[in-house]
């Protein structure tokens, strides 16, 4: 069986100071791997971030991008404002993406994850071709830096995501598999998606959720890992059977006891990995 590493997303702790976040991850949670988020303007001081991470001794499994102006209030809001789809902010978001891609190898990883934005299910929609072109441009820029564009699951069905990746046609495009997002957005069963996405999975989030009464219209609910409907034990088992050897990065984006919830997730994953 493949050996997997347990990590955590830095933003999940909800601690504003990166140094304090890293210390909590290492000393309180006892983890050695992080998925490092770039959601504000911190990327403009790359040496400060690189020095903090190196001093911590933590390994970076991937970097992660988020953008000012993304609105997650409703599914409809994020469909309108998310990722690389909005025309008025694309160039600014492209520039930030390239800047973080410059930092990524210096942190010891070649994986940059991002929600690229809603890709239309209808491939004849004019926005579909726009998203293909933009993804190619981004993938090419990342490729020049030895970095993979790793798209997070959730906003598209697995089938549409695969078709989109094939249309983009770049070897450095892969998937960050987030089982909870499949449920939160209402786009598909996570266990089935693992099998469909298979070799395209380059990084994994460990997050859980329960289904909405109105999938694709209203958000599902994020819950503590192992208490939702994602079937985390089966997902971990399938990933191992398929030969995935990367990081299982715990992500917790709800609740007021993040560190305690992450500690519960660590306990669950350790029991599953044996």
Short names for language-model regions:
Residues 8, 20, 33-34, 63, ...:
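Acidic/histidine-rich catalytic cores of soluble enzymes
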Residues 33, 111, 203, 246-247:
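Residues at the N-termini of beta-strands
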Residues 11-18, 36-48, 68-71, 119-123, ...:
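Acidic-and-aromatic substrate-binding clefts and catalytic sites of carbohydrate-active enzymes
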Residues 1-99, 105, 109, 143, ...:
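N-terminal pre-domain/capping segments
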Residues 228-241:
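A short, acidic, amphipathic alpha-helical segment used as a generic capping/interface helix at domain edges
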Residues 247-253:
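Short acidic/histidine-rich active-site segments
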Residues 20, 72-174, 233:
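Active-site acidic/histidine proton-transfer and metal-coordination neighborhood
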Residues 8, 25, 53, 104, ...:
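Conserved, mostly hydrophobic/aromatic
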